[in-house]
Structures are given as structure tokens and as C-alpha cells.
Design a protein with these regions (language model features):
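N-terminal beta-strand motif that seeds the catalytic metal site of vicinal oxygen chelate
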Residues: 1-19, 69-71, 124-131
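Short loop segments at secondary-structure junctions
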Residues: 15, 47-49, 57, 75-78, ...
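Vicinal oxygen chelate
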Residues: 15-18, 71-116
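Amphipathic alpha-helical segments
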Residues: 18-31
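Short secondary-structure junctions
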Residues: 29-34, 95
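Conserved short beta-strand elements that form part of the metal-binding/catalytic scaffold
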Residues: 32-66, 119-124
Length: 131
């Protein structure tokens, strides 16, 4: 049998593991697949999307991640996902959420930052875009 790549799991540094797990679970409705605080690690899953959370990150690691790395999550029916999570995003601090909008390159997206400022972009091809 030939080897196959079956997924990729970004490892996101977080300052407080419990806070981050709660955010991904309660705001984005990810399922907690692994919660190992003694190992400063958790994994959250929703459909095919997986994110590893690495707890105990220092300020330098958080700043480097926040300023240089983002996760792009491909979505089917962006509007349905937005309707699902928007009520839970209403209480987030200003600047943490950008509602759905159309990029000039033919993709619709919304943006969301986790408690440590890690940027997640949720997007799908705009069906109204001319080929």
C-alpha cells in the first residue's frame, strides 16, 4: 500500500489551555478530542478540521504566532456557519471578529481571532463570482 497524507493539524501556541479549549468548544462548536493539561496539549475537531492547542506559550511565542501565522478553514455554506456562530461572537472584544465579506479575488470569508489573537479565516468560493 502506498503512503497517503490524510490531514494536517496546526499546533497553535496558547497562553491558557482551559480558556482556549472553552473558546473552540463553546464559540466554534469544535469537539474536544484530546484534553491533556498535564502535557499542556489539547486537540479540537469539527468535521475535517483539526487544531492542536499547545498550552503554556510565552509572550514571544504568542506574538510570533499572532503576527505571522493564520489558519484558513475551507467551508461549505459559509453563511450557515456564520449564522450558527455569530450569536456567540457578539460578546467577543472589538477587533476579534470580521463578519462575512467578499474578497476581490472571488472568495467569501469571515475572520475570527482566538483568545490569544491567533487568526482563523473561514472561506468558500463565491458562487456569484464570474469565471
Amino acid at each position: 500500500m502506498d503512503a497517503r497524507l490524510v490531514g494536517i493539524v496546526p499546533l497553535v501556541p496558547v497562553s491558557d489551555l482551559a480558556t482556549s479549549v472553552a473558546f473552540y468548544r463553546d464559540t466554534l462548536r469544535f469537539r474536544v478530542a484530546i484534553d491533556a493539561p498535564d502535557h499542556r496539549y489539547a486537540m479540537v475537531i469539527r468535521e475535517q478540521a483539526r487544531i492542536g492547542l499547545q498550552g503554556g506559550a510565552d509572550a514571544a511565542a504568542l506574538a510570533a504566532t499572532r503576527d505571522n501565522i493564520a489558519a484558513y478553514v475551507l467551508v461549505e455554506d459559509l453563511d450557515a456557519l456564520w449564522r450558527e456562530i455569530a450569536p456567540r461572537c457578539a460578546s467577543l472584544p472589538p477587533g476579534r471578529v470580521r463578519p462575512p465579506f467578499r474578497q476581490d479575488y472571488g472568495v467569501r470569508e469571515f475572520h475570527l481571532k482566538d483568545p490569544d489573537g491567533f487568526l482563523m479565516l473561514f472561506g468558500e468560493a463565491d458562487e456569484n463570482e464570474e469565471p
